[in-house]
Amino acid sequence: MIRNLQEGPNTVEVQETSFSLDVFGRYICNTYDEAISNGGFPFDAVVIGAGMYGSYVAEKIYRQGQGNLRVLLLEAGGFLVSEHVQNLTRIGLNAAAPVSLDPGVPRERVWGLPWRSNVAFPGLAYCVGGRSLYWGGWSPKLTDADLKNWPAELQTYLKANYNDTEKETGVDPTTDFISGALYDALKKAMDTAATRVPTVDGVEVAPLAVQASAPAGLFPFDKYSSAPILTDAVRQAAGDPDSTKRLFLVPRAHVVKLHNTNGVIDAIELRYNGQQKFVSVSPDCAVVLAASTIESTRLALESFPTPLMGRNLMAHLRSNTIVRIARSVLGTLPTQLAAAAMLVRGSTPQGRYHLQVTAAALDGSDSEATMWRVVPDLDLLDQLLASQDFSKVTITFRGIGEMVGDKNASNTNPATSWMDLSPFDSDEFGMPRAYVNLVATPLALTFWNTMDQAAVQLAQTLAGTPANIEYFYDNAWHTAPPPAGKVRDGLGTTHHEAGTLWMGTDPASSILNLDGQFHHIQNGYAAGPALFPALGSANPSLTAFTLARRTARAIVQKAVPVPAVGTLSLLNPALDGWQMAGSGRFNVIGANTVESEGGIGLLWYTKEEFADFLLTVQWRSINSFDNSGVFLRFPVLGNQNPAEDWKLAVDQGYEVQIDDRGFDPNTNTTGSPLHMTGAVYQLAPATRLASKPLGEWNTFEIEATGPDIKVRLNGSLVSHLTNNQGRPLKGHIGLQNHHPGSRVQFRNVFVKRVGAAVEARRAASSR
């Protein structure tokens, strides 16, 4: 045993323990203060839970947003390892066994069970990457039959997008990990045997999330986990100062409640290292619940409950039929054999199942002894191969059967599956725990028997005669098949809980829309199997990842929409076509976002002039003294003193002002309508202050036609200039940086020609 380390007042860049430097944790994670108290703009997305799906969706929001969105990822646990534990040497990290009651201390270092139930569960891995560091890797698609109870739009989406996720996770190509003589022989024999088992529909290549061969020039990532993609994204973002950094991961941050006002989440309550904290969020900020099916649903029930939440709870019926058959029944095989794996799909009127088949010529009951691991020592590899049984092949048929959810479940009915907040049990933070009632109905039990019988029938058909097969149960080999129910796992052991926040088009009969957004919460989303309307027999990972990509895309497109047809997007990562006049600068924050620094100056678009147009600009400020503006119709700059040429835009163009104080430099007073946000500076007053609170995105819609300029701010007409007072009716567009310390961000700068300008451009292009 070693002494517990206590934090002290001294600070270090990287903490040192008795055995190691915490380089991984320090380089990937941030403290709460580093993420929240850095003087930066508010977050555009907050993801709760850095487990299998939280890490994935956070990375997708960051990547798809091309740096335009500021993302915060909150994780209740700490950092453990940076990839799947089976990609490491024999390190001794294992998934925890199921328990009925959590002992109050971590099991296997990071595992805890935060809910209570009528059945045993392994619980959650409280660490970055979560259960994706331990999962089995099986990733089958949902079939057409599985999807029949899903909304048609999602059926189409999944079929069109599954392959992108398969390529990302290593499922495609399918046979780069499992191949060889044993696979070829067993696949051929299995294809034949499958035709003789009535409920079997077919045999497929094993869909395993393992990349054994990478694209040219790259190393394979081996078994997939969400941790490496998150780590890479965090390190990519780490080059920026905290005040402009786009992705933060804060561990030891346990979210206990989401506070909302009129259907808008406005604060996240959490405990950070035991201290109560509140993170304020704006209506623009997407909050994604990705803390597992049970915990995400518990958090939703605690924060903004609806009667449907917690119904439709599903998991999988799982069995493990282990046999060994005579090696001779598979024909002549080489002396040394690699492992083999394949997927067998089946169906009955009661539901669908699949069998995950693994095989190895080893002396023992573990057909996966030479799979799912790194073997760094060639002598150890020789020992493993030498342990092969030259007369037998051990095969495991892991049956996975679907459960049908009950969308009308009552939380007082013990005969059906559901979850709710417990009225009797609170967690260490004083919040109600979830209670999970998970049961197999009589129909499910009948189906479970059928699935188990199919596994035995398939094994017997492979063996040919009873003399060629033995069955493993009760820790011994037997000549008789296992009795009914003997090889089953508990209902809570699969890690496949799903359905309690299901998606749909009708708010009266579903909880989330088809993008994973809560029907009744403007900025609330969820990710993971909780979204599933129905589960099918397929492991939920591939489908949940694919849906998370859709949710991330919806969040990004809401913040950074694609320009409409006929609309020109002016901003770009290289600021191509833009030039700085005066002092100061604009910093590129994302592919479509810039932030002012210093001043006074003007970033102006040089490529072309605009006459009649509709200009849309989103902007936000962080301090009441921030000042900026959008300039229109000014002549070419740069012909005079570079430090002064911006003044030409002031003297001859038009400025739509950004200054909520309405400061008038002529009288040194505030509250001037001619100098207030939305005014055409000193030409047309703002009739009202329509800007949103500091930190929130505002939208200008500026319509210029002839001498007429109308300014709408967040949908309200705030100023109208009807007399151009001799100023140009055509010119350039620019963004102002006003003074040192003023920070204003701009994004989505879209311009569309209207009216006479469109006709003139058409005429010019036809010549």
Predicted feature descriptions by range:
Residues 563-767:
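Carbohydrate-interacting regions of secretory-pathway proteins
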Residues 84-85, 91-179, 185, 405-425:
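Redox-cofactor-proximal catalytic regions of oxidoreductases
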Residues 250-251, 256-257, 450-533:
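A glycine-rich dinucleotide-binding beta-alpha-beta segment and adjacent secondary-structure elements
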Residues 78, 289-291, 296-297, 301-411, ...:
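Mid-to-C-terminal "cap/lid" subdomains and adjacent gly/pro-rich loops that border
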Residues 43-72:
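N-terminal Rossmann-like FAD-binding beta1-loop-alpha1 element of flavoenzymes
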Residues 145-146, 151-257, 261, 466-473, ...:
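Conserved redox-cofactor binding core of oxidoreductases
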Residues 1-44, 63, 67, 557, ...:
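Extreme N-terminal leader/targeting segments of oxidoreductases
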Residues 62-89, 258, 269-343, 528, ...:
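Glycine-rich loop(s) and the adjacent beta-strand/alpha-helix scaffold that form part
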